[in-house]
Amino acid sequence: MPRLQQKWLNSRECPTLRGEAAKGLFPTKDDPSAHKRMSPSDKDILILCCKLGIALLCLGLLGEVAVRARRALTLDSFNNNSSVQDYNLNDSENSTFLLGQGPQPTSSYKPHRICPLEIEIRMLAKKYIFTNKTNPIGRLLVTMLRNESLSFSTIFTQIQKLEMGIENRKRRSKSIEEQVQGLLASGLEVKKGKKSVFVKIGDRWWQPRTYRGPYIYRPTDAPLPYTGRYDLNWDRWVTINGYKVLYRSLPFRERLARARPPWCMLTEKEKDDMKQQVHDYIYLGTGMHFWGKVFHTKEGAVAGLIEHYSAKTYGMSYYD
């Protein structure tokens, strides 16, 4: 061993392992086999493990005793209240509304391990379950009691949310008939939908509280013009990655960029007539009266060009 290291090990001013703590752990000049002698044998390790196991067992037993004592005390105080003795969730009266809500216990309901705040949950359950058996809050509480999954504060937050939702629904939900009566009194034309009421203002049907002044018919709702095509069913479609995609199946942003309302509203008869003409032109090489009107200008230049080229190239006319 180098002289310096040996000096440091023998030194009483060791910076990390001070004084006697270092003695017997490292080989020194006086005791070269100290580290071998001090290492624990297998027997020592076994004894230490046994001691640790016994200590843990004692701790567990103590905990179990404490839990049982607390449960006994809690149930004694709880059973004094007669109205809560009905809290047997397997009783048909209280559990009918829970059928279909999830797996039911196969044996009779046994009170499970009581967590610190279960008494408060039970008091809340007493408040909610017996007033209205279909109450979502009662159902939530029963689920929580069975699962033992969430803390009381979480459950309480859920209850508050549910209560707020119920209150809002109560405030909002007039029946459709009541809404119709109220709006008819205003002298407007009213029609009843599945979930709401519509009022006719001008020539459009509006839901209550959505009317924002006179409606202006603008030429387009989209920032870009429609760049796709119409098929024979008069559906708009565009080519995306080599596939024909109907614009109504596109997500909103793509649809917004590609789609716009038609230039003019056509009647069903006009649409059918155009489809028929397209069909005749493709399969029979005749028709296309409509396109003559579209392309015709005052001087007839465009129409003449079309006529000339189509007659020359394809041997057919756009007009009869």
UniProtKB/Swiss-Prot annotation:
Signal peptide: none annotated. One of its GO terms (cellular component) is membrane. The keyword Membrane applies. It is a single-pass type II membrane protein. The chain crosses the membrane at residues 45-65. Its main location: membrane. Residues 66-320 are extracellular. Glycans are attached at residues 80-81, 90, 94, 132, 147. It is found in: Membrane. Coiled coil: none annotated. Keywords: Glycoprotein, Membrane, Signal-anchor, Superantigen, Transmembrane, Transmembrane helix. It comes from the Viruses. Residues 1-44 are cytoplasmic. Belongs to the mouse mammary tumor virus PR73 superantigen family. This protein is coded in the long terminal repeat (LTR). Superantigen. This is Protein PR73.
